[in-house]
């Protein structure tokens, strides 16, 4: 009190008491205001509730992804007799082998998707193709906001529950530094999870589909808040990716999709769940040793069956692929287009929707609409191959000889614009940036699609994508 008296020299007795009383009132009122400001509702303070910071995560593939589908230029090998091997029936306890990214993202979540009307993306191999920081810088220079990284699960979990995350973590950091959004595409279960094998060992789901949900959950837990989309499998209408005793099976795939969707959304509702993109096959083929076993199925038929089984309720976006063969993107399969100089004659001598980028993607959309849904497409792989300037070309990819580098550039850009204008495509990923750098040579089916040549120099499509408008 003595301090107050010294600061109030000259006041009379009554005035002093009044001043003291007034001071006490101000102290009490100020304290109440301070308390309410800290603890009161955010909306009353004119502030937004805290939101998580949106960052980026990625993973990559130790091996390559198919650059084209069998119905578009390659033959699908027949399966042979199966050999049974024991398979663990329990979901393994996850074990972290390397890295600590999960701890850094422990409490964050991805902001709910939906504000972006169209996402421009590209597939990148950020582990096997060199320094991920360099490649993410190239994506940024292209002006693209999304990267696709395929995860061949079998390459990273040799032992149940033990995943080597080191390559994943490096790519996550590189993408985060560039502010890129990431779509994981997960495919190919480890051999220990599957009982069916044959002489032509290929990708397959696990016997216990719960293992897929477990792996998806571990991905989200580790990179929570930095994964923006996950594609659940890849080209599951081919036994190349669904090599099981029963063969291609839409029922089992949709069950896998439901389990994966639940595992992902329960951890991070903001992640875009994409159904596995189908391969445009142009027909159906059965195993010559087992006529009841389908080794590939027409994509329109498979899509219709997925829809009947409720797949649209287990995804945010319907995955789609089309690698454009030697037809321009705006040409329908049945309009009589012909290129008399073409070496690869499939689209001209045997017309079918599967040859046409336009007809295939519009056909998917029409089937979704017919089911009463407005679910968008996510085109997780598209592009045109050109072998111009290469010393060779992949077997079965004669169409890559028909497309010049200038046509590749023109058609890649045109396809992006068409998908943007359609309004029913949410994300589109060009195939691919840098698979030419994996060291597999001109017979690699992925290399003719790449924007980077074998010598590391940009091909014309690189500059065309960089310079195209991206509204």
Which sequence ranges carry the predicted segments?
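Short, acidic/polar
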Residues: 126-141, 211-219, 296-308, 409-418
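Noncatalytic carbohydrate-binding groove/subsite architecture in carbohydrate-active enzymes
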Residues: 113-117, 209, 213, 248-402
